UniProtKB/Swiss-Prot annotation:
Homotetramer. It comes from Leptospira interrogans serogroup Icterohaemorrhagiae serovar Lai (strain 56601). The active site is at 384 (nucleophile), 510, 512. This is CTP synthase. It catalyses: UTP + L-glutamine + ATP + H2O = CTP + L-glutamate + ADP + phosphate + 2 H(+); L-glutamine + H2O = L-glutamate + NH4(+); UTP + NH4(+) + ATP = CTP + ADP + phosphate + 2 H(+). CTP binds at residues 15, 150-152, 190-195, 226.
Length: 538
C-alpha cells in the first residue's frame, strides 16, 4: 500500500444523494492541490456488472478503456479528474462472491469453512489494495454504494471498519453523505434523520470523520453545532452541500468554499498545498455566461430516464462550453415519431443525435428522425445503434434497398446492411461478451471526421455486437455515404459520413465516454459548432 491513503464515502437517510458526484468533486479538489488520486466504486448488487441491467434499473452503462461495463458514477470520476479508470475501479458483490467461490472450488481455502468474515471482507479489501499497489496514488477515494442500513452493504462497511482498525485514522478517513430534509409545514431543516444514520454507522463500528449534509439551503452555524454535538464530529467537519440548480460542475467550487478538501487534508495530517483551481473555475464561468443557445434533439428509447444517457448529455454540454453555447435538450421518444408527427416534433431543433441502444423498440422512429436530419441539412450525430440506423435509413431511401435492416432487428431481412460481428457468432453468454473497450480507428484524410479529430489514428471505446456489412460498402460509397473511418486492418467500419450534408456523422463507437468539461470531445464540439451555424440560418 506504501503511501496511499483511503477516503471512504458512505451514504445515509436516502439514496440518490450524489455520492458519486461528491467523490468526483473531492478528487477534483485534491488534484487541484497537486495530489494524485484514484477513485473506486463498490456496488452491493449481486450482478457481476451492470452490463445486462435495464437502464430503467441502473441508468447508463459506462465503459472503461479496458472494456469493463461499469456504473455511471465512473463517468463522473473520469470527467472531474485526470484518472484513467479500469475494471479494477468497479467492484460488485457479484464479483467478490464469484472470486471467493471459484477459490473454494479450487481448494484454495484448504478445507476451511468459507464465511462472510473473513473471506468476503478480505476479498473486498484486496480489491482496494490492488489499486493502491498498481497505481500508487496519494489518495484512493472509495464510494460505498447503497445506503447505510441496507443489508447488502454490511460486508463492505465491515471491510472498511477493519481497514481503519488496521491502518489508523491518519491513513483511513470516513466521509458520510447524508440528507437534512426541510419540512415545508414547519419551515425548518431537521437533523434527526442524520443523527439516526450516524447512530446506525456507529453500531457497525464506524465513526464518521466528516459529515456532508445535503440541504435545500445553506446550513446555519446552529445546525452545524447541533450535528457536531450529537454525531461526535468536529463542527468544522460538518459540510453544507446545498442544492445547485445550474450545473453539476459548480459542485467542486461549492465544496471548495466549504473547505472540504482542507478539512480532509488537515484530518489526515497532510500538507495543505496551494490550490490551482483556475482551469476549472474558468470552465464553470464560461458555462454560466453563454452567448447563445441551441436546441438538440436526443432521440432514444430510454429518454424518460435522465441517467440513461448521462454521458451523452454531459458531452453535449461540453461541446457547448467549447463554443460559448448553452445546449437545451429536446428529449424525443422515438415511439412518438411517425409520418404524421415527426416534422412537427423536430422542426425547431438545430441538431439531432441518436444514441446507442439495443432492441427493436423505437427503431422506425429513430430512422424517421435521421431521414428528417438528412433531407433538411440538420446536423446529425449517430452513435453505435444511431450510426446503424443511419446506414439503414440511407439504404432504404437513397439506395432503394427497401428491405434494408439490421439482423438484430429483422434476422431474415433481404438486405442485411448491418449484421452480427463474425466473432460473436458462437457466443451464447450475454454478459460481458460484446466488443468492449478502446480500439484504434484509422480516419481517412480529407473527411469531416479528420477535420474534427485532426488525426489519422484515434482510439475510441466500443460496446456493440453488430457492424456495417462489408459487402455493401462499395454501393454506399458510390452513392454518397462514405466510409470515413475503419479498424486499422480495414475490416470493420467505424465512421460513416455524407460529404454533401452540412454535418452528418455516424460512429460505431461511444465518443461520450472520453469527453471532459475542460477538454470537450472533438465530435461533440464539432456537432455543436455545426448546430450553432444551422441555428443562425433563420
Amino acid at each position: 500500500m506504501s503511501r496511499t491513503k483511503f477516503i471512504f464515502v458512505t451514504g445515509g437517510v436516502s439514496s440518490s444523494l450524489g455520492k458519486g458526484v461528491t467523490v468526483a468533486a473531492l478528487g477534483c479538489l485534491l488534484e487541484s492541490r497537486g495530489y494524485t488520486v484514484s477513485l473506486q466504486k463498490m456496488d452491493p448488487y449481486i450482478n457481476i456488472d451492470p452490463g445486462t441491467m435495464s437502464p430503467y434499473q441502473h441508468g447508463e452503462v459506462y465503459v472503461t478503456a479496458d472494456g469493463a461495463e461499469t456504473d455511471l458514477d465512473l463517468g463522473y470520476y473520469e470527467r472531474f479528474t485526470h484518472s484513467k479508470l479500469t475494471r479494477k475501479n468497479s467492484v460488485s458483490t457479484g464479483q467478490i462472491y464469484n472470486t471467493v467461490i471459484q477459490r473454494e472450488r479450487k481448494g484454495d481455502y484448504l478445507g476451511r469453512t468459507v464465511q462472510v468474515v473473513p473471506h468476503i471482507t478480505n476479498e473486498i479489501r484486496n480489491r482496494m489494495y490492488i489499486v493502491a499497489r498498481e497505481e500508487n496514488p496519494d489518495f484512493i477515494i472509495v464510494e460505498i454504494g447503497g445506503t447505510v442500513g441496507d443489508i447488502e452493504s454490511i460486508p463492505f462497511l465491515e471491510a472498511i471498519r477493519q481497514m481503519r482498525y488496521e491502518h489508523g485514522s491518519s491513513n483511513v478517513l470516513f466521509v458520510h453523505l447524508t440528507l437534512v430534509p426541510t419540512i415545508t409545514a414547519a419551515g425548518e431543516a431537521k437533523t434527526k434523520p442524520t443523527q439516526h444514520s450516524v447512530k446506525e454507522l456507529l453500531g457497525l463500528g464506524i465513526q464518521p470523520d466528516i459529515l456532508v449534509c445535503r440541504v435545500s439551503q445553506p446550513m446555519t452555524k446552529e445546525m452545524k453545532n447541533k450535528l457536531s454535538l450529537f454525531c461526535n464530529v468536529k463542527e468544522e467537519n460538518v459540510i453544507s452541500a446545498s442544492d445547485i440548480s445550474t450545473s453539476i460542475y459548480e459542485i467542486p467550487k461549492m465544496y471548495k468554499e466549504e473547505k472540504l478538501d482542507e478539512v480532509v487534508l488537515k484530518t489526515m495530517g497532510m500538507e495543505l498545498r496551494e490550490s490551482n483551481f483556475s482551469e476549472w473555475d474558468k470552465m464553470v464561468k464560461g458555462l454560466l455566461t453563454t452567448k447563445q443557445t441551441v436546441q438538440i434533439a436526443v432521440v432514444g428509447k430510454y429518454i424518460s430516464l435522465q441517467d440513461a444517457y448521462r454521458s451523452i448529455y454531459e458531452s453535449l454540454s461540453h461541446g457547448g462550453i467549447a463554443h460559448d453555447t448553452k445546449v437545451e435538450f429536446i428529449k424525443v421518444d422515438p415511439e412518438n415519431l411517425n409520418k404524421d408527427s415527426y416534422v412537427e416534433i423536430l422542426k425547431k431543433v438545430h441538431g439531432i443525435l441518436v444514441p446507442g441502444g439495443f432492441g427493436d423498440r423505437g427503431i422506425e422512429g429513430k430512422i424517421l428522425a435521421i431521414q428528417y436530419a438528412r433531407t433538411n441539412g440538420i446536423p446529425f450525430l449517430g452513435i453505435c445503434l444511431g450510426m446503424q440506423c443511419a446506414v439503414v435509413e440511407y439504404g432504404r431511401n437513397v439506395l432503394g434497398l427497401k428491405d434494408a435492416n439490421s439482423t438484430e432487428i429483422r434476422p431474415d431481412t433481404e438486405h442485411p446492411v448491418i449484421s452480427l460481428l463474425e466473432e460473436q457468432n458462437d457466443i451464447e453468454q450475454m454478459g460481458g461478451t460484446m466488443r468492449l473497450g478502446s480500439y484504434p480507428c484509422k480516419v481517412k484524410e480529407n473527411t469531416l471526421s479528420y477535420s474534427e479529430y485532426k488525426s489519422i489514428l484515434i482510439h475510441e471505446r466500443h460496446r456493440h455486437r453488430f457492424e456495417f456489412t462489408n459487402r455493401y460498402r462499395k454501393q454506399y460509397e458510390e452513392n454518397g455515404m462514405i466510409i470515413a473511418g475503419t479498424s486499422p486492418d480495414d475490416n470493420l467500419v467505424e465512421i460513416v459520413e455524407i460529404p454533401k450534408h452540412n454535418w452528418f456523422i455516424g460512429v460505431q463507437f461511444h465518443p461520450e465516454f472520453q469527453s471532459k468539461p475542460t477538454l470537450p470531445h472533438p465530435l461533440f464540439a464539432g456537432f455543436i459548432r455545426a448546430s450553432v451555424k444551422y441555428s443562425k440560418k433563420g
